[in-house]
Amino acid sequence: MEEGHKEPLVLRVEGSHCSLSEMDDFDLTRALEKPRQLKIERKRSFDERSMSELSTGYVRQDSILEMAHSPGSRSMVDTPLSVRNSFEPHPMVAEAWEALRRSMVFFRGQPVGTIAAYDHASEEVLNYDQVFVRDFVPSALAFLMNGEPDIVKNFLLKTLQLQGWEKRVDRFKLGEGVMPASFKVLHDPVRKTDTIIADFGESAIGRVAPVDSGFWWIILLRAYTKSTGDLTLSETPECQRGMRLILSLCLSEGFDTFPTLLCADGCSMVDRRMGVYGYPIEIQALFFMALRCALSMLKPDEEGRDFIERIVKRLHALSFHMRSYFWLDFQQLNDIYRYKTEEYSHTAVNKFNVMPDSIPDWVFDFMPLRGGYFVGNVSPARMDFRWFSLGNCVSILSSLATPDQSMAIMDLLEHRWEELVGEMPLKICYPCIESHEWRIVTGCDPKNTRWSYHNGGSWPVLLWTLTAACIKTGRPQIARRAIDLIESRLHRDCWPEYYDGKQGRYVGKQARKYQTWSIAGYLVAKMMLEDPSHIGMISLEEDKQMKPVIKRSASWTC
């Protein structure tokens, strides 16, 4: 399929309504007020707060001071900032940058992304030579933190153009707002032409559309805006329309009784059958973060105002629902253990009719007295008690988790380090499923065997989300400990995609080498620790209007 646009659009917009840094602290109820002109603050000094605050309790977003860097304020030479700014840079850093630049993809001479893996030793390329939206996020953050925003801008514009394509799976037409899972650039050396082929799920295993792609696109658009201070891109009619199309898919009215998004298996990073159908924590956390990012970037004009109103209402409902019903700590586990069932009334405590006998044995030993996490899934008569790393880390970054809940997640990580981190950060989920349950849940998937791939495998890319969460909660020592583990093996093992085993000791049996997001995740984690102000790109302060939920009383059986 030939790419419809010969050159990237030249986009301009008149004026701006408010700076993004001001919008992040936005009181949701004020979103409905008449817009007023505010001064754009493009730079903020990082020396207003002591760096020692990062190791004392929960850190406020404004303490980290989200700097909006001017594109010209950083050198564009090939020597990365993470090397230049460190007195004794780890030798892995320079080699990681070299590998990351090798993975860059060009369309008509312009960089538009990075391929999933640069593993020439692998016999089967499959789709690892494509640019995946979710995979490019850590690469994009690395380039932004290094003062190289052009590739990120090109990626945002190119995927925005792909969103406008007609999307079909067999004879069924997908929603207009669906973002591609990936795209591939084909170079014709004879005709000297470049062609883009996009995949919206029609070629994916299981033929599932990527629900997370649109959310990552919105989050990355905000990260670009925060990093560069350039508001013009997000305010263009094209980007405004792109956001509205994505939001239309997930804010439409239907038969839902919950504010969470109903999803199929395989619609996110866990892109194979793993029992995450329903309301998976990863999608709900990304949904929440994308809504907040969109709220800070949508114009309150005739078309945007309706979306702003719907976002405000959905955020209030979603935050209450997630904090009330997805949160699990020692007390809540004890309450569920004592639940009555078959309650019929508005006063029911066990609102989802969760059967206490369905609580798996492992969770009683796993749950410490101090600590907690958002469970994997909640739906009628079903609660998935598994820990999912990405969903919990994004919950911290988006402030879906309250400050107390964020600290509890960090406490759990420290208490259960051997189980959740082991010898290689970070378990994608815990625990694995095996035996008869594995056969039923995965359909006997040979790739998702116990402690492998998505079934309890260890994924180095998750290091960047862990590091960001550690910095936001004032626990950078946890991130340093994880980075030390990464630096002891990742380069020696040729940057694999994932590790296998209960402790994450073995390179994954089907893991690709030189996996780009493993490389980029390491670089982003290193740069955030060196300059914690970078966290402003991918972190949001808690909104004061979304009050922490009051603890519910237990359903007593006596």
From Swiss-Prot:
Keywords: Carbohydrate metabolism, Cytoplasm, Glycosidase, Hydrolase, Phosphoprotein
Origin: domain of life: Eukaryota
Modified residues (Phosphoserine): 16, 19, 50, 555
Gene Ontology CC annotation, any one: cytosol
Keyword Hydrolase attributed: yes
Subcellular location: Cytoplasm, Cytosol
Modified residues (Phosphothreonine): 79
Example GO molecular function: beta-fructofuranosidase activity
Pfam assignment, any one: Glyco_hydro_100
Main subcellular location of this protein, as a coarse class: cytoplasm
Keyword Transport: no
PANTHER family: ALKALINE_NEUTRAL INVERTASE CINV2, PTHR31916
Family per record: Belongs to the glycosyl hydrolase 100 family.
Primary role: Cytosolic invertase that may cleave sucrose into glucose and fructose, and that is involved in the regulation of root growth. May regulate sugar-mediated root development by controlling sucrose catabolism in root cells.
Name of the protein in its database record: Alkaline/neutral invertase CINV2
Organism in which the protein naturally occurs: Arabidopsis thaliana
Taxonomic lineage of the native organism: Eukaryota, Viridiplantae, Streptophyta, Embryophyta, Tracheophyta
Name of the gene: CINV2
